[in-house]
């Protein structure tokens, strides 16, 4: 039955995507779009090889050696991206052992949401995904490469790289992660310290010490947010070397896994990206998201990725998959364990084995791990080890080593996935239920409407919010201000929830992948900037958020006939004016062209 249901979901997606998918494949494999180094003029070729070692110039210029692109998101600001500094040299060295070479074709920007969280720079965050996609395309537009490596990990970077890569889907491509930082202070202790600071129980210096014990090394943050959800999705899509997501950066195995990615691409056996990414692989990523309680941000990113290769995915598909796939993992914020503990007790390889065993994952996909004798997701059911400095894969364990963190399909944490779609007279919204305790999944309370995130924080500081209420924060969607994450509200709402108050959040903005403790109806669509119903809400309106029943409604008789709350008239009138400061004015055209959250929040102006 589950297998049959998954097949039905896939068939619906295939049918609605028939024309757009055919057009994508036709364009990607059009002969005029294929790499052309042999047909370039001699001056053009000389520019390609000018900076290369002398002994490689003629072989590469005459295409006697394969030449691969490296698109890197390396910088020192992101702990997860700092390890990428040395990856190009590792890749180049390994490729030369296989009569091939690589060039860093482009660097792409990579911003840290952890740094900009709660500040104006966060308004660039979602749009940075599209800038990364554009930057990726610029790097590959030289059109002289036989394939490409993509070095990225964090929130907007992997989706942006993949969106850009899919415009060059004729190239064989491998995504290379850096892995999570080693564990520091437990994530729940960090969250408690933030709440204690918000309540005035500890001072700034005490909080800073705790934060630095949490974020203390190279690698991704150890909670299961968007960055680590990205890595999960790349595994489920078959774009990583198998089970390479959660190996720490300084583990000797990490270097060998990077070298293995180079071997894979040099072998010539990796299919073009457009043949790897299709309805099945996209659904596999969605299945993995639900089974592991992944980030809400992928209700945007996965849709954008799918549309970039002609596949029309929507929130109804998320709902259908969530109803079918059980929750198998409890990693912070869904539980107290971090991704290192998750990896130690079985990790993604156990999740994949379980889903395949129960017919809850498409096995017959193409991956970068395909061999002549074995293709598909079975290649991701083995664990990598280092023996005599050689990479070997062995059968993974068949049971979880800690059922408080990881469980089999036969005994899941929940029968359904970690995300739900809410519907009602406010529109449609996303909620992450896997981190919400049962007693908080339904809230009926009066609305308090806020114009800005800072207004909420100020009123909390003044102890004006110590009651049951639903916080309503409109004009945080893509067209309003770039859809910033509102994770800074989580600490304060969580503190109020711990005090015994019934609280919830309704917004057209986003939350961090680390959010989840407080019931939050996010990505509300239509957004306020498109005259969505959220801008009709007034202080005192009774709102019901009922996650178990997928419902979100304002329980006022006059609501649907009501006009805009006068509080927001000025905001609505000023939407087309640019926001200045921190470069936000440069992103005005992206904001004005962006599509809806349900369509992926893409700003390219492409209609799919």
UniProtKB/Swiss-Prot annotation:
Its cofactor is [4Fe-4S] cluster. [4Fe-4S] cluster binds at residues 154, 221. Pathway: Carbohydrate metabolism; Entner-Doudoroff pathway. Its EC number is 4.2.1.12. Binds 1 [4Fe-4S] cluster. GO terms for cellular component: cytosol. Keywords: 4Fe-4S, Carbohydrate metabolism, Gluconate utilization, Iron, Iron-sulfur, Lyase, Metal-binding. The keyword Repressor does not apply. It catalyses: 6-phospho-D-gluconate = 2-dehydro-3-deoxy-6-phospho-D-gluconate + H2O. GO terms for molecular function: 4 iron, 4 sulfur cluster binding; hydro-lyase activity; metal ion binding; phosphogluconate dehydratase activity. Signal peptide: none annotated. InterPro entries: 6-phosphgluc_deHydtase (IPR004786), Dihydro-acid_dehy_C (IPR042096), DiOHA_6PGluconate_deHydtase_CS (IPR020558), ILV_EDD_C (IPR056740), ILV_EDD_N (IPR000581), IlvD/EDD_N (IPR037237). The keyword S-adenosyl-L-methionine does not apply. GO terms for biological process: D-gluconate metabolic process; Entner-Doudoroff pathway through 6-phosphogluconate. Belongs to the IlvD/Edd family. HAMAP family: Edd. This is Phosphogluconate dehydratase. It comes from Helicobacter pylori (strain ATCC 700392 / 26695) (Campylobacter pylori).
